[in-house]
Amino acid sequence: MSRISIEQVKHVADLARLAMTDEEAELFTKQLDAIITFAEQLNELDTENVPPTSHVLDMRNVMREDEPEPGLPREEVLKNAPDQQDGQFRVPAILE
């Protein structure tokens, strides 16, 4: 027995302003039913002794220390600029 109907799929598609053919609605109904069935299987798992976690893998800081380094010379930075003025990038105005 399907847990979701074609009418429900069409209703949600209509709410999302998505155009959907009858064939697509039937396909999505089957796919959503499979997803709901899988989610119900997950609900049956015993997680009593499983500690809460926000990530599947252990998380640790893998970033290097933030150490200042000398920057590039201004001329080298500006050589790729499409437009420059007074040693700075010049960009088109976006506000009037």
From Swiss-Prot:
Superkingdom, natural source: Bacteria
Catalysed reactions, semicolon-separated: L-glutamyl-tRNA(Gln) + L-glutamine + ATP + H2O = L-glutaminyl-tRNA(Gln) + L-glutamate + ADP + phosphate + H(+); L-aspartyl-tRNA(Asn) + L-glutamine + ATP + H2O = L-asparaginyl-tRNA(Asn) + L-glutamate + ADP + phosphate + 2 H(+)
Disulfide partners: none
An individual GO BP term: glutaminyl-tRNAGln biosynthesis via transamidation
Top EC class for this record: ligase
Enzyme Commission number(s): 6.3.5.-
Annotated family: Belongs to the GatC family.
Protein name: Aspartyl/glutamyl-tRNA(Asn/Gln) amidotransferase subunit C
